[in-house]
């Protein structure tokens, strides 16, 4: 078998895997990922070059001469050009594996509860110095590279690895190996996967004589009788150092995300590359303890969404960390306010609760704004016209009112149940990043919900707040389109350079997001027709049953004759109905699919219509938006394909199917629905 030259090792073994990892990570790779990997490449290149030059001059390893036909292209400081390429390739491979292994994690959840003192950190970093001394003080009879020194490679390795690794471990080791948040497993995977692969590549290369390790400079233990143990240790320890360096970057980002308001006060926070901001660096190296409350708030939000909004939480892994943590806080606020207003056991006066939330919005954002250019307000052809008081696509947002921590604490203490304080604090962190109007729309949707469950009089009169398709779509705009619009503003805050320049362009993106949010709400309504009816909630338009004239906007259906008897069947499920309950009788035949499928079809039309606008979002959030939409629309597909027998039971999607769908959409882009 012909021996391989060094460059051929790259062509066959390292560059293909690098290309594959680049392909896999390209939809989710962020500027911050590129930034931190680039930092590590620079450090690896700068630190390893003099070290490698030194061990080559001391005869630790050699490469074939040009005359052998396996020679290298050339050298600089005695180091082959191909070796310089290896410095870069290994760091990037490990960095991309780290991105894949940690993308599903929220950086802030791994922050330690307490900070070590500066003296403690310094002592931890100095611990390895005596160990290094023991290795480097080992007697060597001569500096001549031909002289036997079996500990040379191991000593050299300890000199290269130990100081930076111990410093990084002292600063961010506890963060990188946090078991509670799951980061430790991802850290170990990010170290071991590239390590095992590169050890195998080295095994092949040494066996092929692509390069040679001097037997006189190693202890003599070989893996498989071929690869010196020092080579395996090199890959393990350098990958440990790389991953700890990447973890330190994420550590600073976590401090920025959780404690940015403490650092910057009411000033606008920078949106990218938090490592280079002196205030964040000062907090990273500071021995001052920081509040554990922001982390606890985020933990409670994650727990809430894992229990009540699993589809969103799984899909949110497609967003960059900065956007994702803000969206988790925003979505948790929406869930909490829904519970506050909608649950009698939580709030005995839901209208007063709506007033309380509105007052909180005034505290954060000031009074409602009115459109500066009403003629610029756009509407979707598939949705009702936007409310005339809706502001146009404002950017940048006007400065928010000044809000001191004491004012926030006072409001929460006096007016919000203590178990929900976390969600209000998380929304307060978005002050200045999102507008008020979509949240006012959300409250308008809650007001519609308060009409349910229907009174006995309303049941007898066949009267609901959702009379026509336009009413249904307006409700969807309020409770879901508004949240999607807020998502756009959160994404713009993370990438201000990618915000469309004109009002018309911004409005097009916002309208597309409202279409998508409404589409997802229609899927939820289609899924929950029976469950909602048993709670006295009726979101199907009365016009579906021929009980009202349809609006100009009409969801196409398969029937032409009025079907008021079907609405009566639904009413019989309501707790306030005086009609005989027929749910368990032989005569109860409600064709659930007949009414759910038109909603799903219209939702898919809305989603498709929104794709062009959604694709104009900042590049880094597009994968997350696709994932969120696909996760919800999968429920619609479940209704169409899997729902058998018109039983009307609530459909859920298996977790593994949801994850598979999210991954496929993130990697491939929009798919035909």
Swiss-Prot record:
Bilayer disposition of the protein = Multi-pass membrane protein
Q: Where is this region: Disordered?
A: 376-399
Name the CDD domains on file. Answer: Trans_IPPS_HH (cd00683)
* Keyword field: Carotenoid biosynthesis, Isomerase, Membrane, Multifunctional enzyme, Transferase, Transmembrane, Transmembrane helix
Q: Which residues cross the membrane?
A: 9-29, 36-56, 81-101, 117-137, 157-177, 187-207, 226-246
Pathway the protein contributes to: Carotenoid biosynthesis; beta-carotene biosynthesis; Carotenoid biosynthesis; phytoene biosynthesis; all-trans-phytoene from geranylgeranyl diphosphate: step 1/1
What induces its synthesis? Answer: Down-regulated in stationary phase.
Q: Which cellular component, as a GO term, is one annotated location? A: membrane
The record's EC number reads 5.5.1.19, 2.5.1.32
Q: According to its UniProt record, which reaction does this protein catalyse?
A: all-trans-lycopene = gamma-carotene; gamma-carotene = all-trans-beta-carotene; 2 (2E,6E,10E)-geranylgeranyl diphosphate = 15-cis-phytoene + 2 diphosphate
InterPro entries given in the database record = Isoprenoid_synthase_dom_sf, Lycopene_cyclase_dom, Squ/phyt_synthse, Squalene/phytoene_synthase_CS, Trans_IPPS_HH
- Renumbered to this chain, region (Phytoene synthase) spans 258-673
Q: Which Pfam families match?
A: SQS_PSY
**Per its record, how is this protein called by name?**
Bifunctional lycopene cyclase/phytoene synthase
Q: Name the gene that codes for it.
A: crtYB
């Amino acid at each position: 078998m012909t021996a391989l030259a060094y460059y051929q090792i790259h062509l066959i073994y390292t560059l293909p895997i690098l290309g594959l990892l680049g392909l896999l990570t390209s939809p989710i790779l962020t500027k911050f990922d590129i930034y931190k990997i680039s930092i590590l490449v620079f450090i690896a290149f700068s630190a390893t070059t003099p070290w490698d030059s030194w061990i080559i001059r001391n005869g630790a390893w050699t490469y074939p001469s040009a005359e052998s036909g396996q020679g290298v292209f050339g050298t600089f400081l005695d180091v082959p050009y191909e070796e310089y390429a290896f410095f870069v390739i290994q760091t990037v491979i490990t960095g991309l594996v780290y991105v894949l292994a940690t993308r599903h994690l929220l950086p802030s959840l791994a922050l330690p509860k307490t900070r070590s003192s500066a003296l403690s950190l310094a002592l931890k970093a100095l611990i390895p110095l005596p160990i290094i001394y023991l290795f480097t003080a080992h007697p060597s009879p001569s500096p001549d590279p031909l002289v036997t020194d079996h500990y040379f490679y191991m000593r050299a390795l300890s000199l290269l690895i130990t100081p930076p690794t111990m410093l990084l471990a002292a600063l961010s080791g506890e963060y990188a190996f946090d078991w509670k948040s799951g980061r430790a497993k991802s850290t170990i995977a990010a170290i071991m996967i590239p390590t095992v692969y590169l050890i195998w590549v080295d095994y092949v290369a040494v066996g092929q004589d692509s390069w040679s390790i001097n037997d006189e400079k190693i202890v003599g233990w070989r893996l498989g009788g071929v690869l010196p143990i020092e080579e395996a240790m090199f890959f393990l320890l350098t990958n440990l150092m790389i991953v700890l360096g990447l973890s330190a970057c994420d550590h600073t980002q976590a401090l920025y995300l959780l404690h940015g308001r403490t650092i910057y006060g009411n000033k606008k926070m920078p949106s990218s590359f938090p490592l280079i901001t002196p205030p964040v660096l000062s907090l990273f190296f500071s021995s001052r303890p920081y509040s554990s409350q922001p982390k606890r708030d985020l933990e409670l939000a994650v727990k809430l969404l894992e229990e009540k909004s699993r589809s969103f939480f799984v899909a949110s892994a497609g967003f960059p960390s900065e956007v994702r943590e803000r969206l988790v806080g925003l979505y948790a606020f929406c869930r909490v306010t829904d519970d506050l207003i909608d649950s009698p056991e939580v709030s005995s006066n839901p209208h007063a609760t709506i007033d309380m939330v509105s007052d909180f919005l005034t505290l954060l954002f000031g009074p409602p704004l009115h459109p500066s250019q009403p003629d610029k307000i756009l509407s979707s052809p598939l949705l009702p016209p936007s409310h005339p008081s809706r502001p146009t696509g404002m950017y940048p947002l006007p400065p928010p009112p000044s809000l001191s921590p004491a004012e926030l604490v006072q409001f929460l203490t006096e007016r919000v149940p203590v178990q929900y304080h976390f969600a209000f604090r998380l929304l307060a962190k978005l002050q200045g990043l999102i507008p008020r109007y979509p949240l006012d729309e959300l409250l308008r949707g809650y007001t519609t919900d308060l009409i349910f469950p229907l009174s006995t009089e309303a049941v007898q009169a066949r009267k609901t707040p959702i009379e026509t398709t336009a009413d249904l779509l307006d409700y969807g705009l309020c409770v879901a389109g508004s949240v999607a619009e807020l998502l756009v503003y959160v994404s713009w805050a993370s990438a201000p350079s990618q915000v469309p320049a004109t009002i018309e362009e911004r409005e097009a993106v916002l309208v597309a997001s409202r279409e998508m949010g409404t589409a997802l709400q229609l899927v939820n309504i289609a899924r929950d027709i029976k469950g909602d009816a048993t709670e006295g909630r009726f979101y199907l338009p009365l016009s579906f049953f021929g009980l009202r004239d349809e609006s100009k906007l009409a969801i196409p259906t398969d029937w032409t004759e009025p079907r008021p008897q079907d609405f009566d069947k639904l009413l019989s499920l309501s707790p306030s109905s005086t009609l005989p309950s027929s749910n368990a009788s032989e005569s109860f035949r409600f064709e659930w699919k007949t009414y759910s499928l038109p909603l799903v079809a219209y939702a898919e039309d809305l989603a498709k219509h929104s794709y062009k606008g959604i694709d104009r979002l900042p590049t880094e959030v597009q994968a997350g938006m696709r994932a969120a939409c696909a996760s919800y629309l999968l429920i619609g597909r479940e209704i169409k394909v899997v729902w058998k027998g018109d039983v009307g039971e609530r459909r859920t999607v298996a977790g593994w199917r949801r994850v598979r769908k999210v991954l496929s959409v993130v990697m491939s882009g929009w798919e035909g629905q």
